[in-house]
Amino acid sequence: MLTSELGCCYISNTVSSLNLLAEKECSQVRSTVYELKELWLKRNPDIPFYTLGAASYLDAAIEPQDYYSKALLYNPILCDRLGWLYERLADRLAQLLKARTSYHQNYALPGFHVYLACKLFEQPIASIHCDSQYKLINWESGDRTDFNNPISFTLAISLPKFGGGLNTWNLHHQEIANISRSEFVQLVKSRTKTYYPYQIGELILHSGHTVHQIAPAKNIQPDDERITLQGHALFSQGSWQIYW
């Protein structure tokens, strides 16, 4: 853990983890996600990839107001059905980061990625990127918000039979800020890639400014699925504001 100019602890460029849910609790969350299946949004016409909840990197990128409208729709439902999960997440992050945590009423609660069985997921089709979706959101007190030390996290709820995980590269967003796509591809090839396997109920945290990718799956089975809780946090106005 390191300390920023605003005096808060933050996640360094390495990947951290903490046990958040028991396997039985993950099964409970999975059941709730399926009970809300009518609210899933299909995010790609060609593959079975869905979200449950408003996702800033998708919704605010198209039309910012659409993101806030979706958050207004989904937040009460997710809070009602999974309030205990959000309370535990905030409490454990507060312990880890040694600071207050909060959920802003205008921002989306952490939501879910849902990937159903598809052989295409064995290929490296997920983007290699840094998380900069916070730029799409209106932070009410920009001068009291630490944009240099964001946090991204994933909580595995259900995984394919042969597992799932995260690829990261020893590459920071400052190194890729002003380069072309072809230069970025070559730079990624020149850096070390590290694979972090997910475990059911384990929260994986990293700086969103570290270059990363959803790792390709292995030997997808017909009944496989990959369900994860996704979210981010920025230190703003004296607390870590958790959102998606």
Predicted regions and their residues:
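N-terminal auxiliary "cap/dimerization" subdomain that precedes the catalytic jelly-roll/cupin core
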Residues: M1-E87
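Signature of the catalytic double-stranded beta-helix
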Residues: A61-E122, N138-T145
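Short, Φ-rich (hydrophobic/aromatic) sequence segments
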Residues: R30-V33, F153-A156, I227-Q237
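Residue-level detector of short, conserved catalytic/binding motifs and their immediate flanks
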Residues: P110, N149-I151, L155, E202, ...
